[in-house]
Amino acid sequence: MSQSTFVLRRNGFTFKQFFVAHDRCAMKVGTDGILLGAWAPVAGVKRCLDIGAGSGLLALMLAQRTDDSVMIDAVELESEAAAQAQENINQSPWAERINVHTADIQQWITQQTVRFDLIISNPPYYQQGVECSTPQREQARYTTTLDHPSLLTCAAECITEEGFFCVVLPEQIGNGFTELALSMGWHLRLRTDVAENEARLPHRVLLAFSPQAGECFSDRLVIRGPDQNYSEAYTALTQAFYLFM
């Protein structure tokens, strides 16, 4: 499908090589997901897992960034979101490489015999309390259906020894998530703190954990420069995806 066809569509987000419809998904395409999909380390991976796939954004971004031999499994609990993810993937250049599963990850993982070099998730992080407009959005935003200990346990059960488990979270929640992960035997290997501009404190954090101990590399990413245009670093990270960058 051509870029001109993508541009005419209004029910989702247009990227350079694919289109993500998200009108039937509780959580829409946003900066968090784009950051995570562009940032996660893909060198040498053979098999990837997207937990809580939503519209299929992360699976599609990983497919664009990896070799044609890399297979990707995308697991999504909510049936309507999973159906839309499948439609998005069917219309992409990588339909043969991405498998969508409508399933509870905690049940699905027990049936798997393969392990994954890269596991990626843009997980829910709100606790119950703030009212949501729909049950689907509540499921996407709250940790009630998949809390963080369960998410870390699922990832641990199917990751390779040298693999990476990558998430994006609000800064403070990410700090707590890191403490929890370390207490469960994970090792933090990559951390990028994300700020809107140089004057602001980081509001998001990108984290990569591994079962294997090693040096932790950390840095800071600023999204916008003094002129309010995208910074050089953010442009370098995401320009393979944004249509007009």
UniProtKB/Swiss-Prot annotation:
Q: What is its main location?
A: cytoplasm
Molecular functions (GO terms): nucleic acid binding; tRNA (adenine-N6)-methyltransferase activity
Q: Is Cell division given among the entry's keywords?
A: no
- GO CC terms in record: cytoplasm
Q: Does the keyword Membrane apply?
A: no
Tell me where on the tree of life, at the top rank, the source sits: Bacteria
Q: Keywords for this entry?
A: Cytoplasm, Methyltransferase, S-adenosyl-L-methionine, Transferase, tRNA processing
Enzyme class per UniProt: transferase
Query: Which catalysed reactions does the entry list for this protein?
Result: adenosine(37) in tRNA1(Val) + S-adenosyl-L-methionine = N(6)-methyladenosine(37) in tRNA1(Val) + S-adenosyl-L-homocysteine + H(+)
One Pfam family name is MTS
Q: What is its EC number?
A: 2.1.1.223
Compartments annotated for it: namely: Cytoplasm
Q: Which InterPro entries match?
A: DNA_methylase_N6_adenine_CS (IPR002052), SAM-dependent_MTases_sf (IPR029063), Small_mtfrase_dom (IPR007848), tRNA_Adenine-N(6)_MTase (IPR050210), tRNA_adenine-N6_MeTrfase (IPR022882)
Its GO biological process annotations read: methylation; tRNA processing
Disulfide bonds, paired cysteine numbers: none
What this chain does, per the entry, is described as: Specifically methylates the adenine in position 37 of tRNA(1)(Val) (anticodon cmo5UAC).
Q: Which family does it belong to?
A: Belongs to the methyltransferase superfamily. tRNA (adenine-N(6)-)-methyltransferase family.
Q: What's the protein name? A: tRNA1(Val) (adenine(37)-N6)-methyltransferase
Could you tell me which species this protein originates from?
Escherichia coli O7:K1 (strain IAI39 / ExPEC)
**GN (gene name):** yfiC
